[in-house]
Amino acid sequence: MPKKVVTLGEIMLRLSTPDYKRFVQADTFDVTYGGGEANVAAAICNYGENGTFVTKVPNNPIGQSAINHLRRYGVDTQYIARGGDRLGIYFLETGASMRASQVVYDRAGASIADVDISEFDFDKILEGADWFHTTGITPALSDKAAALTMAALKAAKAKGITTSIDLNYRKKLWSKEKAQQVMSELCQFVDVCIGNEEDADTTLGFK
């Protein structure tokens, strides 16, 4: 029987320049969707397991397009909440030769940042789950998103489900002090913590 892995996080609209063009050269963008936790759910499905993704997207065609993108990979999207104002966007300029890639984020006011715990029934979402995964990006989005992450981790631990988190510190989203305050609490409910030495130091104070 396939294993069930539940992931929680943000899915974003990615607009990338074609043919290695710079932002200032491009007059069109290629469109796709992605996010750390969403990508994990898709990868799980590619391995023949059950990947379930939990998030909140706007109740409009862009939100539906993001859901349709996930479904193409076989991701279970039935627990995605609808509402809020918008989907977060990031712009990608793919590097060439010695020129590095550049990313510009436009995610303020995204639906997942204005989420409410009452929109999700984690007892139902986690039923039959073998693993729960999230990242440090999700709680960094807002206090509401951090509370949702905590609720999910607590529910998973109460059910005896293995939990994991990728620290993935982003200084543009929150300060080192805020990250340590929130992540130290979240990691009390985490079995597997993923991160490099720098992220462990920044978010947990481990050297």
Q: Which residues fall in each region the model found?
A:
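Conserved beta-alpha-beta core of the PfkB/ribokinase-like small-molecule kinase fold
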Residues: 137-207
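Glycine-rich phosphate/adenosyl-contacting loop at the front of the ribokinase-like
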Residues: 1-76, 116
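Conserved N-terminal subdomain of the carbohydrate kinase-like
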Residues: 50-136
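General beta-strand structural signal in soluble alpha/beta enzymes
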Residues: 7-8, 79, 105, 164-165, ...
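Glycine-rich beta-alpha junction loops
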Residues: 11, 84, 109, 169-171, ...
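Short, contiguous strand/loop micro-motifs
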Residues: 26-28, 53-54, 107-109, 139-140, ...
